[in-house]
């Protein structure tokens, strides 16, 4: 009976709403969206405290830094006050979270902590960790005094290239890969200790290709979503078909000490549902990797290049029970400008249900961000691209867009 109820709840969650939503968003029945902020520029992740929203930003090389954007909302969820702080220091890092009365925010090379009080803009700050390898640095906390910082493998590189490889030859990966000493993993730090160096951190997990999505699931553990490799069919058409390349998924992993997610030596085959050796390391596109040190994904996103850029577990009480403990995922959408029938994948918000501590199959939660037609799901035509998700104190879900800097608040008004 419980299994049936769970299936029905998740099926209902994928049904479109009857009421018109702003920007043509398509939501499950009983859910409604409201635009709470707009024209914020190239924003990334969000952190919420009461009626305040703190937003991390990314800007181009020729654009001025805007640091962290702070918004104070009125009871009707309209902006009362807007300010900026951390300009030139706490930006370009993506990760941002409110934790134990403070705001933690990543820059490209450090983690900053701002003391929060009744004022919107904090006046006191510390550097918790500095000297990090340049990266996005999503962050998470375990409730036991530990701060987790993710550092990707290097801009989504498929391998750890051997510089001695001739330019006209196929890429060859270094083994062992020296990059794994300083990136492609998760490092653990003391959340309260000021002035830590990168070298003070504990190398907690390894094997990340590219990731901006990291969060702690209450009563469970740390989870990360990794971007699957691309361009494999183009480089090795004799080993991997384009269909097999397109089926290489983004993967959600449950992280424990010494977890190895496989980069750069291996990748997850979405067709065969097995781990394969990367062609740069002698892989033939079909022989499974049997080494038990590589962990299996907890869930996979079978969408071609969806660009999963944020992850938040739902611990609120506003949404129906079937959502509690599950994960909302911001799918930014692939960067390939080519228009394909039916549009590119991503450009939406997905939901990963959990039952008995196990992740289920991801389902679409919010659609329509790119525009009214499937062809809008393209980097050149998309109106909006989800880049961040966060849960407010009242249990509403907030979604951030990187194209125009818009933020929606999604609430539930249906039956419990």
Residue ranges of each PLM-predicted region?
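Beta-propeller domains
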Residues: 54-79, 117, 357
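Asp-box/WD-like beta-propeller blade repeats and closely related beta-sheet repeat scaffolds
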Residues: 81, 87, 92, 97, ...
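Blade-level signature of beta-propeller repeat domains, shared across WD40, Kelch, NHL, RCC1
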Residues: 390-416
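Beta-rich, blade/repeat-based domains predominating
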Residues: 39-51, 87-102, 106, 131-147, ...
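Residue position within the beta-strands of beta-propeller blades
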Residues: 54-56, 105, 148-150, 223-226, ...
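Beta-propeller domain segments
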Residues: 20-26, 153-199, 206-210, 214-376, ...
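Short loop/turn segments immediately following the C-termini of beta-strands
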Residues: 58-60, 108-110, 116, 152-154, ...
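A short loop-to-beta-strand structural motif that recurs across blades of beta-propeller domains
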Residues: 66-69, 110-112, 185-187, 251, ...
């Amino acid at each position: 009976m419980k299994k049936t109820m769970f299936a029905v709840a998740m099926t209902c969650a994928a049904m479109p709403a009857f009421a018109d939503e702003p920007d043509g968003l398509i939501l499950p029945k009983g859910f409604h969206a409201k635009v709470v902020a707009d024209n914020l520029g190239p924003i990334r992740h969000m952190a919420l405290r009461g009626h305040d929203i703190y937003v991390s930003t990314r800007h181009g090389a020729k654009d001025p830094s805007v640091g962290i954007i702070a918004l104070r909302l009125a009871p009707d969820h309209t902006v009362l006050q807007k300010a900026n702080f951390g300009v030139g220091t706490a930006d370009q890092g993506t990760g941002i979270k409110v934790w134990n009365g403070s705001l933690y925010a990543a820059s490209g090379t450090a983690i900053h902590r701002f003391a929060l009080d009744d004022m919107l803009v904090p006046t006191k700050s510390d550097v918790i960790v500095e000297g990090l390898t340049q990266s996005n640095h999503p962050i998470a906390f375990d409730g036991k005094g530990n701060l987790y910082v993710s550092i990707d493998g290097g801009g989504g590189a498929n391998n750890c290239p051997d510089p001695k490889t001739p330019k006209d030859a196929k890429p060859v990966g270094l083994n062992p890969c020296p990059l794994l000493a300083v990136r492609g993993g998760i490092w653990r730090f003391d959340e309260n200790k000021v002035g830590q160096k990168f070298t003070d951190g504990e190398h907690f997990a390894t094997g990340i290709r590219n990731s901006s999505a990291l969060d702690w699931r209450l009563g469970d553990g740390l989870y990360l979503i990794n971007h699957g490799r691309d361009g494999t069919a183009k480089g090795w058409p004799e080993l991997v078909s384009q269909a097999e390349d397109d089926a290489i998924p983004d993967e959600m992993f449950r992280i424990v000490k010494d977890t190895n997610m496989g980069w750069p030596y291996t990748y997850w085959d979405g067709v065969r549902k097995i781990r394969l050796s990367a062609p740069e390391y002698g892989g033939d596109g079909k022989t499974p990797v049997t080494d038990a040190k590589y962990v299996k994904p907890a869930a996979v996103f079978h969408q071609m290049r969806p660009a999963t850029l944020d992850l938040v577990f739902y611990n609120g009480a506003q949404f129906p029970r079937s959502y509690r403990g599950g994960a909302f995922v911001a799918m930014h959408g692939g960067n390939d400008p080519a228009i394909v029938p039916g549009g590119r994948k991503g450009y939406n918000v997905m939901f990963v249900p959990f039952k008995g501590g196990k992740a289920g199959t991801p389902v679409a939660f919010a659609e329509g961000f790119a525009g009214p037609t499937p062809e809008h799901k393209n980097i050149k035509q998309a109106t909006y691209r989800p880049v961040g998700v966060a849960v407010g104190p009242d249990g509403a879900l907030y979604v951030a867009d990187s194209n125009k800097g818009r933020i929606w608040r999604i609430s539930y008004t249906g039956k419990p």
